[in-house]
Amino acid sequence: ENTQPALFVNSFAIFEFFARAGVQADYTAGHSLGEYTAIAAAGGFDFTTGLRLVRQRGLLMSRATRGTMAAIMGADFSAIEKICAEIMHAGDIVVPANQNTPDQTVISGTPEGVKKACDALAAAGAKRVIPLQVSGAFHSPLMKEAAEQMKAALASADIRDTRVPVISNVTGRPVTSGAEIRDLLYQQ
């Protein structure tokens, strides 16, 4: 409820510091919550709209079904996908949530699903498996209800075309269309 707005305010203050010093971005990008700051910095919405959206996002995510995440290092992404799919097929929920680098993927799901995936990936030769201290299974199917409620908040927000492209977390591609940004934030 408070963490996401605090991070947004801090990140936007850093953007403002550089903007007032004359630094101009050709592109903006931010990881997960940081994408909201990137969009505000690019002119896709004003600070107040961004703050309202991230507060709503934080509230909805905090109410979502329990879950957890883990960072997997030194495992092939296709192996992670395969193991997660096998565990999902068996009835637990776990998915690759973020591919941070070619060598690091974060998985997300129920505590049972994530533990099974961690055990299987460690046995398959992952270099490191690190449980993350998080309050939910972010970027997973367990966030579906929160995402649907966030869609309504996004629909009523004044989201405009940006002055500079924003690199989307969902596609990894530059986007400037306000309508496309709205849809991509929902998908995120």
Task: Briefly describe each language-model feature range.
Residues 11, 26, 30-34, 38, ...:
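Gly/Ala-rich beta-loop-alpha elbow adjacent to hydrolase catalytic centers
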Residues 21-30, 47-50, 95:
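Short, flexible active-site-proximal loops enriched in glycine and acidic residues
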Residues 41-188:
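Alpha/beta catalytic cores of group-transfer enzymes, especially the acyltransferase/condensing modules
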